[in-house]
Amino acid sequence: DFDHIVFVPMHKKKRRERGFNQAEEMAIQLSKRMNLSVIEAMERTKNISSQTKQEKFNRFSRSKSVYRSLSGRLKENARILLIDDVLTTGATLVACAESLKRNYACHITVLTFAFTPESGEV
């Protein structure tokens, strides 16, 4: 059981350019089926270049300072379903989960809709 759904945020500039955040859209559709509220509890504070070409170590170090949880959005110890579109190294989800746990001491379950295997795994 979950209290809320939280999605991985996109930087405001990129969101304006694209017109939508795919993780948010997935969260909204899932919330309708699960009868849960979607809470915008995170923000992306930096508009860094895409991490798709970065090595695993670089992704983790770059992601740490990019995501911030917003205060007053969730109750403490909430059970959160954290949504992202694609899992590659896990750096984004780890950064978001750490920020949420640090500020809300919440319980987090992660759901992604795709996985990018490392080369040679397929």
Q: Where are the predicted features?
A:
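Conserved PRPP/pyrophosphate-binding segment of the phosphoribosyltransferase/PRPP-pathway fold
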Residues: D1-L81, T89-V122
